Amino acid sequence: MDGSRAPHWAIQVGRRARRARSAVKAPLRQLGRRLGPRAPVRLRLPGRSREGPTRLARNGPVTLAYDLRGRGAPLVLIQGVGVGRWGWEPVAARLARRFQVITIDNRGIGASDTPPGRYSTRMMADDVLAVLDDAGIQRASVVGTSLGGMIAQELALAHPERVDKLILVATIPGGPRSRPMPLGTTYLFAAAPFMTAKAKLRELVQRTLGPTTLRRRPRVARRLMARKLAHPQPESAWRAQTAAGMLFNPLGRQRRITQPTLIVQGTADQVVDPGNADVLAGLLPNARVQRFEGAGHLLYWERPKRFVRAVTDFLAEAAAEASVPTTA
């Protein structure tokens, strides 16, 4: 073989990367025109409140940052790839009126450590367990979005006695049963190493919000963009979190997740195929689906009041059903 020439597979990868870069140029220009380089940004979000001092838990050598707010039954909120505790700002304060809300920076983002090497959803579920132990919480309901939904499933499988109820938002069942990521997002992930950080963020913002929100409420996109720029994530950590989600595969164990489960899915999600909600519901023995028509991947940014109502109503109904004595 001529060592001066690139192998065939490398040439093909290069061509695909160039096509992926071309595929995202037009959406980037479109979003850039919508947001504008001088668009005013107001960081005050509906439902936002002052946070208490950050607490620190440890899972072995890894330090994890988290917050506690509110009183009531414990409710853990777990974010997805590239988003820290700040991602719950539209809903955390509202939820804290009814629950003791725990928000966490996953490993690889925010004030938590960014250890080198591979991450896994099981590893990150153990991080959540370490936070519960540090906070003195024996049992909690768990809300997980995207990668956070996979982490929540792992937590329920590994430590079922610590999980009361589950709310899984815009997530997947994992493994071969998962429906593939929409093509545009696949192109974005392929092109990400060739893009500037700001360009990648602009495209991510466009893909994580529904088209109706982008068209009618561009301020939501501006706020989200501002928060992402204010809380950058190391590229290596973004890749490690992304890989953890791609490798998530419960291998048929989900039948063991018997906790009452609400699956929440936006019908205009461009990151997770909305059909995954039905697949996941078919695998969990005690699950139901609630759809947000026209909402995207970050549906709790687009419809915060409705999201809080859905979570609150579900937890109240599940608690009421559990309190009804069964007849022999």
Predicted segments, located by residue:
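Conserved alpha/beta-hydrolase catalytic His-Asp/Glu region
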Residues: 177, 198-253
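Active-site loop/oxyanion-hole signature of alpha/beta-hydrolase fold enzymes
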Residues: 107-143, 309
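Catalytic active-site module of serine/aspartate enzymes centered on a nucleophile-bearing elbow/loop
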Residues: 287-328
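Conserved alpha/beta-hydrolase "acid-adjacent" motif
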Residues: 270-276
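Flexible "cap/lid" loop of the alpha/beta hydrolase fold
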Residues: 157, 164-194
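Conserved HGGG/HGGXW glycine-rich cap/lid loop of the alpha/beta-hydrolase fold
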Residues: 60-114
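Short beta-strand/loop motif that positions the catalytic acidic residue
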Residues: 257, 263-265, 269
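Alpha/beta-hydrolase fold catalytic core
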Residues: 4-75, 97-99, 137, 313-328
